[in-house]
């Protein structure tokens, strides 16, 4: 009995088109050969057939931009197939550096004075105060071990899950994502409890006790893991 040839391409039909699971252990050349045999040479479709979206799942294989373009062009030769997305479990070094830059916690020890702006891409851990007229901006969360009396903008790129935490919460203005709020005029006592600001289910910024944060954002554990 002839040995059955191992398949490197698994094709599954979905309501959105086709999903191709590509083997991530075979050689790149073998993968191209099988794609050509199964999708291009066997393609018998009418010239006016509608386009079908193809989603590629390549597992733990990394394709360079040139290889991605080669695979897209090869599949496009089947007349009615077009690659809509390529999903991989790995990322390039540049992508990894960019991801770390946007998700890392940046510790800063200083006082942000009036007219000064402190800007970070990831989460900000500020050990110090933000004076009136000072501004802190972060792509992620903002943690202030000190007094916030100026302006704080968390999740500046649109992350509405971001939060702002301060030992003393007396801000001139709070912003999370594209939502803005000013501190209530009636708040005069500073108290001894740290407070947090977040966007609630009504799409409004709410300031409350820090102890509620574990219930509001149960997945917020990166700060604890990295300190």
Swiss-Prot record:
Cysteines joined through disulfide linkages: none
Gene3D superfamilies the record matches: 2.160.20.70, 3.30.160.540
A matching Pfam family: MinC_N_1
Record GO biological process: cell morphogenesis; division septum assembly; regulation of cell septum assembly
InterPro entries linked: CAP/MinC_C, MinC, MinC_C_sf, MinC_N_1, Septum_form_inhib_MinC_C
Superkingdom of the organism of origin: Bacteria
Keywords of the record: Cell cycle, Cell division, Septation
Family: Belongs to the MinC family.
Summary of the function given for this chain in its UniProt record: Cell division inhibitor that blocks the formation of polar Z ring septums. Rapidly oscillates between the poles of the cell to destabilize FtsZ filaments that have formed before they mature into polar Z rings. Prevents FtsZ polymerization.
Subunit: Interacts with MinD and FtsZ.
Protein name, as recorded: Probable septum site-determining protein MinC
Native species: Geobacillus kaustophilus (strain HTA426)
High-level lineage: Bacteria, Bacillati, Bacillota, Bacilli, Bacillales
């Amino acid at each position: 009995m002839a040995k059955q040839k191992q398949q490197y391409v698994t094709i599954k039909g979905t309501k959105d088109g086709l999903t191709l699971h590509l083997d991530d252990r075979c050689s790149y050349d073998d993968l191209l050969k099988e794609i050509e045999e199964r999708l291009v040479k066997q393609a018998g479709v009418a010239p006016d057939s509608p386009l079908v979206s193809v989603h590629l799942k390549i597992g733990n294989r990394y394709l360079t931009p040139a290889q991605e373009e080669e695979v897209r062009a090869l599949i496009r030769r089947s007349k009615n197939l077009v690659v809509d997305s390529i999903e991989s479990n790995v990322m390039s070094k540049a992508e990894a550096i960019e991801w770390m830059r946007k998700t890392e916690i940046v510790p800063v020890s200083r006082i942000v004075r009036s007219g000064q702006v402190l800007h970070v891409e990831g989460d900000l851990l500020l050990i110090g105060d933000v004076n009136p007229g000072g501004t802190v901006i972060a792509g992620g969360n903002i943690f202030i071990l000190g007094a916030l009396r100026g302006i704080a903008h968390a999740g500046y790129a649109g992350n509405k899950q971001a939060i702002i935490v301060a030992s003393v919460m007396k801000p001139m203005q709070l912003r999370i994502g594209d939502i803005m709020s000013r501190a209530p005029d009636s708040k005069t006592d500073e108290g001894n409890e740290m407070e947090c600001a977040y966007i609630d289910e009504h799409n409004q910024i709410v300031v409350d006790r820090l102890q509620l944060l574990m219930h509001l954002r149960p997945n917020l554990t990166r700060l604890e893991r990295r300190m």
